[in-house]
């Protein structure tokens, strides 16, 4: 697909949209800045005056560090307020209200549907298949429904939240090939660091109808900093930047994120990822042996989806032990399930001990 044709997927009324030209987007140079109506003085709470001025809309140092981390060019990357902002930009930028659909694969992260609803974009569900080896995406069905429903965006969460399953790259490539010129395939890799499946970013050179979502909220432990990344065709990124709010990345958040991507910090992160993966295997095996546990799904994320004979009792037992997990019982097809994030060894042991006590009490 050519660069011009990928822009054909964008709403026609936005293709020439100039967006808001902020004071920080100009190329002017000087040492006295009086062009943005900022205060000339620092706030007493900000003695270093680090937050007196508006931030760079796309901090160059952070953008370069993220591009190096994810294996793309800086111009293929947009930094936003978590992946949520990137999802919202994609839906608003590509979907004509009431016409262009958004395809999702439930059970899955709810923000895709929320953003579609806010844009009045029809929502198309192609449920994950619940098989003996866990949930899986039905790529032929996804492609068929996307083509039949005029879907502009196809969200593939890999690893999927809350299902935990990942999609092989050859399957993602099948979807990309079948939907060229028809839809943008968005691979959400929020939990990619914990997965055995390589990132789909490596397919960008061959498929312009691919976008990848990444975040520093999970493996990099910066959830409160709200640093999300959209990786896609450079021309699409440039257009979406014009649709983005003027100053999406606060200076303190950008500074912390850049420090988190230094070599020493990344080494610590890699060790913690390895610990999570090890705990994932241990806790999976331990949960599967507990009476009252109906099924523990395989996971490529930092969490486990677990079905219980009595999910209410399990949920309450964990609360009584001071452990808060994600109740999935209101989610269609997960009426007996809880999602348990993997914590430290000690935290995971509290989960197992609380559930063990519950089962002993029942027995």
Curated annotation (Swiss-Prot):
Keywords: Amino-acid biosynthesis, Aminotransferase, Histidine biosynthesis, Pyridoxal phosphate, Transferase. The keyword Acyltransferase does not apply. HAMAP family: HisC_aminotrans_2. This is Histidinol-phosphate aminotransferase. It catalyses: L-histidinol phosphate + 2-oxoglutarate = 3-(imidazol-4-yl)-2-oxopropyl phosphate + L-glutamate. Pathway: Amino-acid biosynthesis; L-histidine biosynthesis; L-histidine from 5-phospho-alpha-D-ribose 1-diphosphate: step 7/9. SUPFAM superfamilies: PLP-dependent transferases. Homodimer. It comes from Xanthomonas euvesicatoria pv. vesicatoria (strain 85-10).
């Amino acid at each position: 697909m050519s660069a011009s044709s990928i822009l054909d997927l964008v709403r026609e009324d936005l293709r020439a949209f100039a967006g808001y030209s902020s004071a920080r987007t100009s190329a002017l140079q000087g040492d006295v800045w009086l062009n943005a109506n900022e205060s000339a003085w620092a706030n007493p709470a900000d003695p270093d005056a680090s937050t007196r001025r508006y931030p760079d809309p796309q901090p160059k140092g952070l953008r370069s560090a993220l591009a190096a981390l994810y294996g793309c060019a800086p111009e293929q990357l947009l930094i936003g307020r978590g992946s949520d902002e990137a999802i919202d930009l994609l839906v608003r930028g590509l979907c004509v209200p009431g016409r262009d659909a958004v395809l999702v694969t439930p059970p899955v992260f709810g923000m895709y549907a929320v953003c579609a609803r806010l844009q009045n974009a029809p929502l198309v569900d192609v449920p994950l298949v619940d098989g003996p080896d866990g949930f899986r995406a039905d790529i032929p069905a996804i492609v068929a429904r996307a083509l039949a429903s005029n879907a502009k965006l196809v969200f593939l969460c890999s690893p999927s939240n809350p299902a935990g399953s990942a999609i092989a790259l050859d399957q993602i490539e099948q979807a990309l090939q079948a939907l060229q010129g028809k839809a943008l395939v968005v691979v959400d890799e929020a939990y990619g660091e914990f997965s055995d499946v390589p990132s789909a970013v490596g397919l960008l050179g061959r498929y312009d109808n691919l976008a990848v979502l990444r975040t520093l909220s999970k493996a990099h432990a910066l959830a409160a900093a709200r640093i999300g990344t959209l990786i896609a065709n450079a021309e699409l990124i440039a257009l979406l930047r014009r649709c983005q709010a003027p100053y999406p990345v606060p200076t303190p958040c950008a500074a912390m994120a850049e420090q988190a991507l230094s070599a020493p910090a990344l080494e610590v992160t890699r060790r913690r990822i390895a610990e999570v993966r090890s705990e994932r295997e241990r806790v999976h095996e331990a949960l599967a042996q507990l009476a009252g546990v109906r099924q523990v799904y395989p996971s490529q994320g930092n969490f486990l989806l677990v079905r219980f004979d009595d999910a209410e009792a399990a949920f309450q037992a964990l609360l009584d032990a001071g452990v808060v997990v994600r109740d999935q019982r209101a989610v269609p097809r997960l009426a007996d399930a809880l999602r348990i994030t993997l914590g430290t060894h000690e935290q995971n042991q509290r989960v197992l001990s609380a559930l063990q006590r519950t089962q002993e009490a029942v027995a």
